[in-house]
Amino acid sequence: MSNKTIKLGSIEIANDKPFVLFGGMNVLESRDLAMQIAETYAEVTQKLGIPYVFKASFDKANRSSVNSYRGPGMEEGLKIFQEIKDTFNLPLITDVHEPYQCQPVAEVVDIIQLPAFLARQTDLVVAMAKTGAIINVKKPQFLAPHEMRHIITKFNEAGNDEIILCERGSCFGYNNLVVDMLGMDEMKQSGYPVIFDATHALQRPGGRADSAGGRRAQATELARSGMALGLAGLFIEAHPDPDNAKCDGPCALPLHQLENYLTQMKAIDDLVKSFAPIDTSK
């Protein structure tokens, strides 16, 4: 098995390279907050020497309640993304939900994300593939790791091989997610870069009356476990006031903890990738 390397400017994304951070906020709440969060991430990752891609959503189309905040929408969201890109010289990742969104988003954003709940929607997959952008595929909570090959094949047949696979937990009974660490290793056997969404994996789907709950207190433990696998990247969301975040606050890392958190993750990644591989199949 050979590891595929995806190049994004000077950033190399691969399972055998130093990990890349995909981080930011869940949803764009305001221009000012997005700029504050992007600046904090940029400063911390530059200090620690971690390759970094800023993440946020312009629309959360799968909220538990019709009354929940969804975001500023695509037009306003892309303006904010462009300002972040220009101000901090950061590459960007965001998710799309409809085929018509793919091309305009790809004109601003570097990596387009396929949401877990939509990962089998062929029309969306094809529209994303045709942009030529790098694609981050969130593994659906209801799919086995080996079934990701079908989604990969769809993208390949639509002409796109620039694919990242992202683990974000699997359904375990009602209102609960668990992370199968061996499943991430199984996805790595594809050769494609695998990243770990360590904050969404903390979700308790439908765990509150009209929104998802979460286990923010365990954010460090879960991420440490994932980083021990030697992954291409870590995906996290942070907020200066998680208890009052407009989406997924119960899973968000407190922004003031970002440097301490990433210092530990980098140390684990550096250590694991310094080891020689051991083939225990023989």
Curated annotation (Swiss-Prot):
GO terms for cellular component: cytoplasm. It is found in: Cytoplasm. Pathway: Carbohydrate biosynthesis; 3-deoxy-D-manno-octulosonate biosynthesis; 3-deoxy-D-manno-octulosonate from D-ribulose 5-phosphate: step 2/3; Bacterial outer membrane biogenesis; lipopolysaccharide biosynthesis. The keyword Transferase applies. Keywords: Cytoplasm, Lipopolysaccharide biosynthesis, Transferase. Its EC number is 2.5.1.55. It is an enzyme of class 2 (transferase). It comes from Shewanella loihica (strain ATCC BAA-1088 / PV-4). This is 2-dehydro-3-deoxyphosphooctonate aldolase. NCBIfam families: KDO8P_synth (TIGR01362), PRK05198.1 (NF003543), PRK12457.1 (NF009109). It catalyses: D-arabinose 5-phosphate + phosphoenolpyruvate + H2O = 3-deoxy-alpha-D-manno-2-octulosonate-8-phosphate + phosphate. It comes from the Bacteria. GO terms for molecular function: 3-deoxy-8-phosphooctulonate synthase activity. HAMAP family: KDO8P_synth. The lineage of its organism: Bacteria, Pseudomonadati, Pseudomonadota, Gammaproteobacteria, Alteromonadales. Belongs to the KdsA family. GO terms for biological process: keto-3-deoxy-D-manno-octulosonic acid biosynthetic process.
